[in-house]
Each structure stands twice: as C-alpha cells, then as structure tokens.
C-alpha cells in the first residue's frame, strides 16, 4: 500500500481507503471480516457518514483495540430520525447524533470532522456563518476532532470551502463520468442515465476545484469513485464500456490534490480487487 499526505493536515493516508456505506447491509461478523481485510492490506482511513445505529456499532466493535491505526472521517449533520437517515442542520438533532457516532465507534475523537453533504452555495454560507459551524469549531478547540473537512458533490461549493481558510480538506465525488459534468446543486444530475453527446474532457468547474485545492493544499478524499457501481457495466456506464475498480481508482488518484479513494466493499474479495 502506498500513502499520501492529506493536504496540509499532516496526516498520511492510504491511497485506497474504506468508504463504509455498504457495510450498512451486513452483520457484525461480516463487517469485521471486511475491516480486518482492509487492515491486512494496509488501509488506514475510513469514512463513516451513515447515521444508522447498527453499522456505527459494528464498525466500533471491528476496530476495538485498534483505534490508533485508523484515521476516521466522521460527519456532523447525518442523523437517524424515526428509523431513517436525515441530513439536518438542526442543532438539537446534530449534537446528539455526533455524540452517538463517537460512542458507537468507541472513540473520544475523530481525525477528520466533516460538515456533511453541502451541495448548495447558499447553504454553505449559512452553515459557515451560523451555529452549525460554531459547534464544529468548538469540537476542534476541545480536541474532539483534529481537522475540519466538508463533503460535497458540487465543485463550486468545494472551491468556496477550499478558499474559506477554515476547511482543511474535502470529501468529493470523483470518477471519469462525473468529471465531464458542470457544477450542480442537484446530486441526481450526476446519475442521469445518459450524458449529452457533446460533453468531452474535464469540465472547467471541476478543473478549477482541483487547481484551487492543489494551490491551497486542501487534500481530497474521494467518494463515488465507482459512480455507485454503474461504471462497472457497459449498459449503465455513460461511456458504454465497462471499467474495472482499478481503472476507476487510478483515474481518481491522478487528479490533483487527491490523497485517497474511499471505495465501498461488501466482502473481503472487494477489498482485494480494489488493491490489485
């Protein structure tokens, strides 16, 4: 496994990481098998954005006694309400959900505290000027989080974050298909079944984000590296050609400022395929 500096955070992360979303559909034994395989492959960074209680607890059990070998990326604003995930900026919901994450993971700190899922420019400004960001900064001052990050699918929001002087790293969606598209505040745009035929090359909105992040030393961890798996099938890929996990990971790792691709794994075999 190779490792890269995550921007100016001082953290060294594995080029391939664990995006733990798919673990939500597995029991504790299966989660532990995947995480053990990740450790054996030298993976040292995981993202847990999910609010579902069981998956948080199962990850906590799997890393028990080994917390220090993991760089954990956890999220502010991902909550579990009435049996379902809700993204919110309501501080009465945000605070207990964040405390629940720490408790279930069995840790008293996160390496990367992420402002969760900000795709609208107006919302970015509201967050940064309000109680939500004040709470995030308070957690950093207390040492509960070591660095402040933000997750977005919108390159224009990413640029705002990278230039803010407050955000230290980004979780951003990168794959060969998404890079063709202009900025959008609607995530569904990126999963359209067909792309317009005139699209070609990296869209300027996204090229600018990569340039700004490199200039500002804002490291990027990558989500949606496989476009939710659609790039693996010629039928669902906008290129009408099936790509492999290794091809998708290589693509993301060659973008400026990218430090780690957080792939999703259902099984240890998926981990091995990503690291091939």
Feature roles, as predicted:
Residues 37, 41, 105, 165, ...:
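Structural motif
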Residues 25-38, 89-106, 152-160, 243-251:
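Short, acidic/polar
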Residues 1-74, 108, 141:
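N-terminal binding-site loop/beta-alpha segment at the start of enzyme catalytic domains
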Residues 17-29, 79-95, 121, 125, ...:
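Active-site mouth loops of central-metabolism enzymes
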Residues 5, 13-17, 44-45, 69-73, ...:
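Structural preference for beta-strand elements that scaffold enzyme active sites
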Residues 118-276:
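Beta/alpha (TIM)-barrel catalytic core signal, keyed to glycine-rich beta->alpha loops juxtaposed to Asp/Glu
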Residues 100-124:
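Active-site groove signature of glycoside hydrolases
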Residues 7-23, 73-86, 114-117, 226-230:
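N-terminal small/glycine-rich loop or linker at the start of catalytic domains
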